[in-house]
Protein backbone atom coordinates (compact mmCIF):
# COMPACT_ATOMS: atom_id res chain seq x y z
CA UNK A 1 0.00 0.00 0.00
CA UNK A 2 2.73 2.38 0.80
CA UNK A 3 4.42 1.64 -2.50
CA UNK A 4 1.24 2.42 -4.39
CA UNK A 5 0.75 5.64 -2.49
CA UNK A 6 4.30 6.68 -3.29
CA UNK A 7 3.81 5.86 -6.95
CA UNK A 8 0.60 7.86 -6.94
CA UNK A 9 2.36 10.85 -5.44
CA UNK A 10 5.17 10.60 -7.96
CA UNK A 11 2.66 10.50 -10.79
CA UNK A 12 0.93 13.62 -9.51
CA UNK A 13 4.26 15.43 -9.21
CA UNK A 14 5.16 14.45 -12.73
CA UNK A 15 1.83 15.76 -14.01
CA UNK A 16 2.37 19.03 -12.21
CA UNK A 17 5.89 19.27 -13.62
CA UNK A 18 4.60 18.56 -17.11
CA UNK A 19 1.99 21.29 -16.75
CA UNK A 20 4.72 23.71 -15.66
CA UNK A 21 6.84 22.67 -18.62
CA UNK A 22 3.95 23.34 -20.99
CA UNK A 23 3.51 26.80 -19.54
CA UNK A 24 7.23 27.51 -19.97
CA UNK A 25 7.08 26.21 -23.54
CA UNK A 26 4.20 28.55 -24.28
CA UNK A 27 5.97 31.54 -22.76
CA UNK A 28 9.66 30.98 -23.58
CA UNK A 29 9.59 28.43 -26.38
CA UNK A 30 10.10 24.71 -26.32
CA UNK A 31 13.42 23.17 -25.44
CA UNK A 32 12.47 19.90 -27.16
CA UNK A 33 12.86 21.48 -30.60
CA UNK A 34 16.51 22.20 -29.88
CA UNK A 35 17.23 19.03 -27.98
CA UNK A 36 15.38 16.58 -30.26
CA UNK A 37 15.13 13.01 -29.09
CA UNK A 38 17.19 13.72 -25.96
CA UNK A 39 14.51 15.92 -24.57
CA UNK A 40 11.89 13.30 -25.20
CA UNK A 41 13.94 10.71 -23.36
CA UNK A 42 14.17 13.00 -20.32
CA UNK A 43 10.36 13.11 -20.14
CA UNK A 44 10.12 9.42 -19.37
CA UNK A 45 9.01 8.43 -15.93
CA UNK A 46 11.84 8.38 -13.44
CA UNK A 47 11.69 5.83 -10.61
CA UNK A 48 11.74 7.06 -7.06
CA UNK A 49 15.14 5.69 -6.33
CA UNK A 50 16.74 7.49 -9.20
CA UNK A 51 14.97 10.70 -8.25
CA UNK A 52 16.29 10.48 -4.75
CA UNK A 53 19.73 9.72 -6.01
CA UNK A 54 19.77 12.72 -8.38
CA UNK A 55 18.92 15.24 -5.68
CA UNK A 56 22.32 14.98 -4.02
CA UNK A 57 23.94 15.41 -7.42
CA UNK A 58 22.15 18.71 -7.93
CA UNK A 59 23.21 19.80 -4.47
CA UNK A 60 26.75 18.85 -5.26
CA UNK A 61 26.52 20.77 -8.49
CA UNK A 62 25.23 23.76 -6.63
CA UNK A 63 27.93 23.33 -4.08
CA UNK A 64 30.48 23.11 -6.84
CA UNK A 65 29.08 26.26 -8.38
CA UNK A 66 29.25 28.01 -5.04
CA UNK A 67 32.79 26.80 -4.61
CA UNK A 68 33.70 28.11 -8.02
CA UNK A 69 32.19 31.48 -7.14
CA UNK A 70 34.15 31.53 -3.91
CA UNK A 71 37.31 30.65 -5.79
CA UNK A 72 36.68 33.47 -8.25
CA UNK A 73 36.14 35.90 -5.38
CA UNK A 74 39.37 34.74 -3.79
CA UNK A 75 41.21 35.20 -7.08
CA UNK A 76 39.80 38.74 -7.46
CA UNK A 77 40.90 39.62 -3.94
CA UNK A 78 44.36 38.25 -4.60
CA UNK A 79 44.60 40.31 -7.82
CA UNK A 80 43.51 43.45 -5.94
CA UNK A 81 46.13 42.76 -3.29
CA UNK A 82 48.78 42.30 -6.00
CA UNK A 83 47.78 45.60 -7.64
CA UNK A 84 47.99 47.42 -4.30
CA UNK A 85 51.43 45.97 -3.69
CA UNK A 86 52.54 47.03 -7.19
CA UNK A 87 51.29 50.57 -6.54
CA UNK A 88 53.18 50.71 -3.27
CA UNK A 89 56.30 49.43 -4.97
CA UNK A 90 55.98 52.03 -7.74
CA UNK A 91 55.51 54.77 -5.13
CA UNK A 92 58.56 53.60 -3.27
CA UNK A 93 60.58 53.67 -6.50
CA UNK A 94 60.06 57.46 -6.88
CA UNK A 95 63.27 59.35 -6.05
CA UNK A 96 63.27 63.02 -5.02
CA UNK A 97 66.47 64.80 -6.14
CA UNK A 98 67.17 68.00 -4.20
CA UNK A 99 70.72 68.77 -5.30
CA UNK A 100 71.28 70.78 -8.51
CA UNK A 101 74.77 69.53 -9.19
CA UNK A 102 75.47 66.88 -11.80
CA UNK A 103 75.73 63.33 -10.53
CA UNK A 104 78.75 61.81 -12.18
CA UNK A 105 77.61 58.29 -11.31
CA UNK A 106 74.58 58.60 -13.63
CA UNK A 107 76.32 60.23 -16.57
CA UNK A 108 77.47 58.25 -19.55
CA UNK A 109 80.79 58.64 -21.28
CA UNK A 110 79.45 61.06 -23.90
CA UNK A 111 78.06 63.42 -21.27
CA UNK A 112 81.36 63.36 -19.38
CA UNK A 113 83.28 64.40 -22.48
CA UNK A 114 80.99 67.35 -23.36
CA UNK A 115 82.27 69.79 -20.66
CA UNK A 116 85.84 69.42 -21.81
CA UNK A 117 84.91 69.97 -25.43
CA UNK A 118 82.80 73.00 -24.49
CA UNK A 119 85.70 74.44 -22.48
CA UNK A 120 88.08 73.98 -25.38
CA UNK A 121 85.57 75.59 -27.76
CA UNK A 122 85.12 78.63 -25.50
CA UNK A 123 88.87 79.05 -25.04
CA UNK A 124 89.37 78.91 -28.81
CA UNK A 125 86.61 81.48 -29.33
CA UNK A 126 88.14 83.84 -26.74
CA UNK A 127 91.57 83.53 -28.33
CA UNK A 128 90.04 84.35 -31.72
CA UNK A 129 88.08 87.33 -30.39
CA UNK A 130 90.94 88.88 -28.38
CA UNK A 131 93.06 90.18 -31.33
CA UNK A 132 89.97 91.50 -33.07
CA UNK A 133 89.02 93.58 -30.02
CA UNK A 134 92.56 94.96 -29.76
CA UNK A 135 92.53 96.00 -33.39
CA UNK A 136 89.08 97.56 -33.14
CA UNK A 137 90.07 99.79 -30.18
CA UNK A 138 91.75 102.52 -32.33
CA UNK A 139 88.78 102.55 -34.66
CA UNK A 140 86.46 103.12 -31.72
CA UNK A 141 88.70 105.95 -30.50
CA UNK A 142 88.59 107.60 -33.90
CA UNK A 143 84.84 107.28 -34.10
CA UNK A 144 84.36 108.82 -30.65
CA UNK A 145 86.02 112.01 -31.89
CA UNK A 146 83.34 112.52 -34.49
CA UNK A 147 80.21 111.76 -32.51
CA UNK A 148 78.01 114.02 -34.60
CA UNK A 149 78.80 112.19 -37.81
CA UNK A 150 78.24 108.86 -36.10
CA UNK A 151 74.84 109.98 -34.91
CA UNK A 152 73.90 111.11 -38.40
CA UNK A 153 74.98 107.79 -39.89
CA UNK A 154 73.26 105.66 -37.29
CA UNK A 155 71.41 102.77 -38.82
CA UNK A 156 67.66 103.07 -38.52
CA UNK A 157 67.78 106.66 -37.24
CA UNK A 158 65.13 109.11 -38.40
CA UNK A 159 66.49 112.00 -40.46
CA UNK A 160 64.41 114.98 -39.37
CA UNK A 161 66.02 117.24 -41.97
CA UNK A 162 65.02 115.07 -44.92
CA UNK A 163 61.87 115.91 -46.87
CA UNK A 164 59.13 113.34 -46.45
CA UNK A 165 58.10 111.24 -49.42
CA UNK A 166 54.80 109.79 -50.57
CA UNK A 167 55.06 106.93 -53.06
CA UNK A 168 58.59 108.02 -53.95
CA UNK A 169 57.67 111.70 -54.53
CA UNK A 170 58.56 114.52 -52.08
CA UNK A 171 55.51 115.89 -50.33
CA UNK A 172 56.49 119.44 -51.30
CA UNK A 173 55.92 118.46 -54.94
CA UNK A 174 52.50 116.87 -54.39
CA UNK A 175 49.31 118.84 -54.87
CA UNK A 176 46.69 117.67 -52.33
CA UNK A 177 43.96 118.28 -54.88
CA UNK A 178 45.44 115.58 -57.12
CA UNK A 179 45.15 112.90 -54.44
CA UNK A 180 42.15 110.62 -54.84
CA UNK A 181 41.71 110.02 -51.14
CA UNK A 182 41.62 112.94 -48.70
CA UNK A 183 41.22 111.35 -45.26
CA UNK A 184 41.71 114.68 -43.45
CA UNK A 185 38.37 115.83 -44.86
CA UNK A 186 36.43 113.03 -43.26
CA UNK A 187 34.25 113.98 -40.28
CA UNK A 188 36.07 113.61 -36.98
CA UNK A 189 39.54 113.46 -38.57
CA UNK A 190 42.43 115.09 -36.70
CA UNK A 191 44.36 117.48 -38.94
CA UNK A 192 47.50 117.13 -36.82
CA UNK A 193 47.78 113.56 -38.11
CA UNK A 194 48.26 114.87 -41.65
CA UNK A 195 49.51 118.49 -41.32
CA UNK A 196 52.28 119.50 -38.91
CA UNK A 197 53.12 122.89 -37.37
CA UNK A 198 49.50 124.03 -37.38
CA UNK A 199 49.06 123.83 -41.16
CA UNK A 200 45.69 123.26 -42.74
CA UNK A 201 44.91 122.31 -46.29
CA UNK A 202 44.54 125.97 -47.34
CA UNK A 203 47.67 127.25 -45.58
CA UNK A 204 49.67 124.30 -46.87
CA UNK A 205 48.65 125.13 -50.43
CA UNK A 206 49.71 128.76 -49.91
CA UNK A 207 53.04 127.63 -48.50
CA UNK A 208 53.67 125.34 -51.47
CA UNK A 209 52.88 128.09 -54.00
CA UNK A 210 55.11 130.57 -52.17
CA UNK A 211 58.02 128.13 -52.06
CA UNK A 212 57.60 127.36 -55.73
CA UNK A 213 57.59 131.07 -56.58
CA UNK A 214 60.74 131.72 -54.53
CA UNK A 215 62.54 128.83 -56.18
CA UNK A 216 61.69 130.19 -59.61
CA UNK A 217 62.70 133.77 -58.79
CA UNK A 218 65.90 132.92 -56.94
CA UNK A 219 68.85 133.20 -59.31
CA UNK A 220 72.27 133.92 -57.79
CA UNK A 221 73.73 134.90 -61.16
CA UNK A 222 70.99 137.45 -61.73
CA UNK A 223 71.50 138.97 -58.27
CA UNK A 224 75.27 139.25 -58.82
CA UNK A 225 74.81 140.93 -62.19
CA UNK A 226 72.46 143.48 -60.60
CA UNK A 227 75.04 144.36 -57.94
CA UNK A 228 77.75 144.80 -60.59
CA UNK A 229 75.49 147.13 -62.59
CA UNK A 230 74.85 149.29 -59.53
CA UNK A 231 78.56 149.40 -58.80
CA UNK A 232 79.41 150.55 -62.34
CA UNK A 233 76.81 153.29 -62.09
CA UNK A 234 78.47 154.54 -58.88
CA UNK A 235 75.39 154.14 -56.77
CA UNK A 236 77.10 151.85 -54.29
CA UNK A 237 79.82 154.48 -53.34
CA UNK A 238 77.60 157.59 -53.00
CA UNK A 239 76.79 156.94 -49.39
CA UNK A 240 80.46 156.58 -48.44
CA UNK A 241 81.48 159.78 -50.27
CA UNK A 242 78.70 161.80 -48.69
CA UNK A 243 79.63 160.62 -45.22
CA UNK A 244 83.25 161.58 -45.86
CA UNK A 245 82.25 165.08 -46.96
CA UNK A 246 80.12 165.56 -43.88
CA UNK A 247 82.95 164.45 -41.60
CA UNK A 248 85.42 166.78 -43.31
CA UNK A 249 83.03 169.70 -42.96
CA UNK A 250 82.54 168.97 -39.28
CA UNK A 251 86.30 168.84 -38.78
CA UNK A 252 86.78 172.24 -40.44
CA UNK A 253 84.16 173.84 -38.21
CA UNK A 254 85.83 172.39 -35.15
CA UNK A 255 89.22 173.85 -36.19
CA UNK A 256 87.65 177.23 -36.88
CA UNK A 257 86.29 177.37 -33.34
CA UNK A 258 89.64 176.53 -31.77
CA UNK A 259 91.84 178.90 -33.77
CA UNK A 260 90.91 182.33 -35.16
CA UNK A 261 93.02 181.64 -38.24
CA UNK A 262 90.74 180.41 -41.01
CA UNK A 263 93.67 179.19 -43.05
CA UNK A 264 94.29 176.38 -40.55
CA UNK A 265 94.57 172.99 -42.18
CA UNK A 266 91.54 170.75 -41.99
CA UNK A 267 91.48 167.36 -40.33
CA UNK A 268 92.39 164.39 -42.48
CA UNK A 269 89.42 162.90 -44.26
CA UNK A 270 88.65 159.25 -43.68
CA UNK A 271 89.87 156.97 -46.41
CA UNK A 272 87.28 156.44 -49.10
CA UNK A 273 86.28 152.95 -50.21
CA UNK A 274 88.08 151.77 -53.31
CA UNK A 275 86.09 151.20 -56.45
CA UNK A 276 84.37 147.87 -56.52
CA UNK A 277 83.88 147.58 -52.75
CA UNK A 278 80.36 147.95 -51.34
CA UNK A 279 79.88 150.27 -48.36
CA UNK A 280 80.14 148.63 -44.97
CA UNK A 281 78.91 149.71 -41.56
CA UNK A 282 76.36 152.06 -43.11
CA UNK A 283 78.90 153.85 -45.32
CA UNK A 284 81.43 154.39 -42.52
CA UNK A 285 84.92 152.94 -42.80
CA UNK A 286 85.68 149.92 -40.66
CA UNK A 287 87.32 150.51 -37.30
CA UNK A 288 91.06 149.76 -37.29
CA UNK A 289 92.30 146.93 -35.13
CA UNK A 290 94.59 147.68 -32.18
CA UNK A 291 98.16 148.37 -33.34
CA UNK A 292 97.03 148.93 -36.92
CA UNK A 293 97.94 152.20 -38.68
CA UNK A 294 95.02 153.54 -40.70
CA UNK A 295 95.79 154.25 -44.38
CA UNK A 296 96.77 157.76 -45.64
CA UNK A 297 97.84 158.65 -42.13
CA UNK A 298 101.37 159.59 -43.22
CA UNK A 299 100.12 161.85 -46.00
CA UNK A 300 97.67 163.52 -43.67
CA UNK A 301 100.35 164.13 -41.04
CA UNK A 302 102.65 165.63 -43.71
CA UNK A 303 99.94 167.95 -44.87
CA UNK A 304 99.23 169.01 -41.31
CA UNK A 305 102.91 169.76 -40.70
CA UNK A 306 103.27 171.90 -43.77
CA UNK A 307 100.06 173.72 -42.97
CA UNK A 308 101.23 174.46 -39.46
CA UNK A 309 104.54 175.79 -40.73
CA UNK A 310 102.73 178.03 -43.18
CA UNK A 311 100.42 179.28 -40.48
CA UNK A 312 103.36 180.07 -38.25
CA UNK A 313 105.04 182.00 -41.09
CA UNK A 314 101.96 184.03 -41.81
CA UNK A 315 101.44 184.80 -38.18
CA UNK A 316 105.01 185.97 -37.81
CA UNK A 317 104.64 188.10 -40.91
CA UNK A 318 101.54 189.65 -39.54
CA UNK A 319 103.39 190.52 -36.35
CA UNK A 320 106.18 192.17 -38.23
CA UNK A 321 103.70 194.17 -40.21
CA UNK A 322 102.05 195.37 -37.05
CA UNK A 323 105.32 196.50 -35.70
UniProtKB/Swiss-Prot annotation:
Keyword Nucleus assigned: yes
Q: Where is this region: Disordered?
A: 1-94, 292-323
Keyword Membrane among record annotations? no
Report the record's disulfide bonds: none
Q: Where is the composition biased (Acidic residues)?
A: 19-34, 66-94
In which family does this protein belong, per the annotation? Belongs to the FIP1 family.
Q: Where is the composition biased (Low complexity)?
A: 294-323
Give the UniProt keywords, A-Z: mRNA processing, Nucleus
Q: What is its main location?
A: nucleus
Q: Per UniProt, what is one Pfam family of this protein?
A: Fip1
- Record's protein name: Pre-mRNA polyadenylation factor FIP1
Where located?
A: Nucleus
Kindly give the InterPro entries that the UniProt entry links to this protein.
Answer: Fip1_dom (IPR007854), Pre-mRNA_3'-end_processing_reg (IPR051187)
Q: Which GO terms describe its cellular component?
A: mRNA cleavage and polyadenylation specificity factor complex
Amino acid sequence: MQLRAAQHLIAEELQMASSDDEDEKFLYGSEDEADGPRGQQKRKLIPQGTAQIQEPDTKRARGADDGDVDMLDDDDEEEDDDEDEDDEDSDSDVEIIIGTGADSSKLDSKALTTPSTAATATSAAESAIAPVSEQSAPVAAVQSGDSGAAMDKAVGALDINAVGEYEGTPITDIDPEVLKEKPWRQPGANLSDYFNYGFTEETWMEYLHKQEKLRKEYNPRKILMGLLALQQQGKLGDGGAGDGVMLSAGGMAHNDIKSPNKNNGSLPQPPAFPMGMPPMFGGFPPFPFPGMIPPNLGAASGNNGSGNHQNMGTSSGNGNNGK
